[in-house]
From Swiss-Prot:
It is found in: Cytoplasm. This is Co-chaperonin GroES. Together with the chaperonin GroEL, plays an essential role in assisting protein folding. The GroEL-GroES system forms a nano-cage that allows encapsulation of the non-native substrate proteins and provides a physical environment optimized to promote and accelerate protein folding. GroES binds to the apical surface of the GroEL ring, thereby capping the opening of the GroEL channel. Belongs to the GroES chaperonin family. The gene is groES. CDD domains: cpn10.
Amino acid sequence: MSSISLSVLDDSVLIKPINEEKQGGIVLPSSAEKKPTKGEVIAIGEGSRNSSGERIALTVKAGDKVFYRQWAGTEIEHGSEKLIVMKESDILAIIK
């Protein structure tokens, strides 16, 4: 797991995409490549608030490997790392 010095808010999740290795030696331009849909959770927010003001804990935790929607979230760069900030609801599954 990475040691990133970022905090995300509410029900947001910070993901480091995992790029799958390409087989066969075919090089595609970046515009033709499929966006990754698998990543590692780096950080999570404290959760959104319910109508009583209490925090609703997130299901995922830092270190989880997950599948997420292909066009989910906002891509950011922090140092040399490309990361994605998304809502927990954009995560489809936790890989066990």
